[in-house]
């Protein structure tokens, strides 16, 4: 119902000022709002954004401190950690600079591309960074994305997940981190533009361009396709940090082909790179290699910071099993402790587990599934037996014998008996 003064002059529905007392009176469905109330709302929203940013920037650790914390959770990848630490630190310092209003020099956003084999720690690095900075974080799988209007997930749904992670606090969400995995799977299907529409490859890259660069996106709070009549949330993506990751299988061949091309001739050694491993080859990565792989130049341009991760060797996998704060072996030991059971994994068994993961080419990601398979029967039994010791040996890992289960009670009584026998008469 429209509010009127003296049945003639319209008034603001919020502050009740008459039309002649304000500069503008904007009409909505059965309500009016004046320019002064709009300014007040804008100031409130800006203040909320400033407070949210201050909470983040006031607690930003230095790049060296970020690296030190990453070392507690992620094994190896020292160069990637250093690059990420500097990039993230500079990103949030840039936000502080922009918020201060001192814009004599424009600082552009620098999104990040992580390239490395499966299980090398790309996702874990992004997750750990978000924990360190205490900012909203969400992950998306690029393979599930399609262009708007096609069967699949819209890119705006990524922003919806970030909003949910921020508990629908728009100011906090606008300072969050989004990790998009498997970006190598949205590479253009061929190097030449196709006459048919590539809705899950180049089409997704095109759809991601705007939100990665910075735009005010309309985000459907209930998901876009099932509720077309809903009100949209406006989310500014200018200050959201995008980290993309992928294995980029085959890009090493592109790099090798490029680096060997200049040496082709009668005396050329075309197999010069055969002795190099993938990690060494990836260090020679150039932008043109990514273009040839299938990423469009505009998409690569939105990811100015590119870093490669090393393939994990046997020693690194053993370290991952035991050393980090949330090491997998520590987690399983704690799980068994909850059932009054001691878990013992011999060093030779750890080596055998690492060798299995290397053989499967799953990297660190495969370690948990190997351990889960080894310990399944033991976890099934100890919940009822209690007071047990479960020992995993190399033979257990190789499937030659079952996990060795002994009673802790009998072990303690045997020790006590031997101590009594050792006492001289």
UniProtKB/Swiss-Prot annotation:
ATP binds at residues 117-124. GO terms for cellular component: HslUV protease complex. It comes from the Bacteria. Zn(2+) binds at residues 12, 15, 34, 37. Keywords: ATP-binding, Chaperone, Metal-binding, Nucleotide-binding, Zinc. Residues 1-53 form the ClpX-type ZB domain. The keyword Chaperone applies. Belongs to the ClpX chaperone family. This is ATP-dependent Clp protease ATP-binding subunit ClpX. It comes from Rickettsia akari (strain Hartford). The lineage of its organism: Bacteria, Pseudomonadati, Pseudomonadota, Alphaproteobacteria, Rickettsiales. The gene is clpX.
């Amino acid at each position: 119902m429209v509010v009127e003064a003296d049945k003639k002059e319209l008034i603001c529905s919020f502050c009740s000022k008459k039309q002649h007392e304000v500069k503008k009176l904007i009409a909505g469905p059965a309500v009016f709002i004046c320019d002064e109330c709009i300014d007040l709302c804008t100031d409130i929203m800006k203040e909320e954004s400033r407070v949210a940013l201050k909470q983040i920037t006031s607690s930003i650790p230095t790049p060296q401190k970020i690296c030190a914390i990453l070392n507690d959770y992620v094994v190896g990848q020292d160069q990637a950690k250093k690059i990420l630490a500097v990039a993230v630190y500079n990103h949030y310092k840039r936000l502080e600079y922009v918020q201060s209003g001192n814009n004599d020099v424009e600082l552009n956003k620098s999104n990040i591309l992580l390239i490395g084999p499966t299980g090398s720690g790309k996702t874990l690095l992004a997750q750990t960074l978000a924990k360190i900075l205490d900012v909203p974080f969400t992950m998306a799988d690029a393979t599930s994305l399609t262009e708007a209007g096609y069967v699949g997930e819209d890119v705006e749904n990524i922003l919806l997940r970030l909003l949910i992670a921020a508990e629908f606090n728009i100011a906090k969400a606008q300072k969050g981190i989004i990790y998009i995995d498997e970006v190598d799977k949205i590479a253009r299907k061929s190097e030449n533009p196709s006459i048919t529409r590539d809705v899950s490859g180049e089409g997704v890259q095109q759809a991601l361009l705007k939100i990665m660069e910075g735009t005010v996106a309309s985000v459907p709070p209930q998901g876009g396709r099932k509720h077309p009549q809903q009100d949209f949330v406006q989310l500014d993506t200018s200050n959201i940090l995008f980290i993309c990751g992928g294995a980029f299988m085959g890009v090493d061949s592109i790099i090798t082909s490029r680096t060997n091309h200049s040496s082709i001739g009668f005396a050329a050694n075309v197999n010069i790179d055969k002795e190099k491993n993938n990690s060494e080859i990836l260090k020679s990565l150039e932008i043109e290699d990514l273009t040839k792989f299938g990423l469009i130049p505009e998409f690569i341009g939105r990811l100015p910071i590119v870093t490669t991760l090393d393939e994990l060797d046997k020693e690194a996998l053993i370290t991952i099993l035991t050393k980090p704060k949330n090491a997998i072996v520590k987690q399983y030991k704690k799980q068994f402790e909850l059932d009054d059971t001691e878990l013992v994994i011999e060093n030779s068994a750890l080596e055998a587990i690492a060798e299995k993961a290397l053989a499967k080419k799953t990297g660190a990601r495969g370690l948990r599934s190997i351990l889960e398979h080894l310990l399944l029967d033991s976890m099934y039994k100890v919940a009822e037996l209690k007071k047990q010791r479960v020992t995993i040996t190399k033979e257990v890992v190789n499937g030659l014998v079952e996990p060795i289960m002994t009673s802790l009670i009998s072990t303690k009584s045997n020790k006590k008996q031997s101590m009594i026998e050792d006492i001289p008469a």
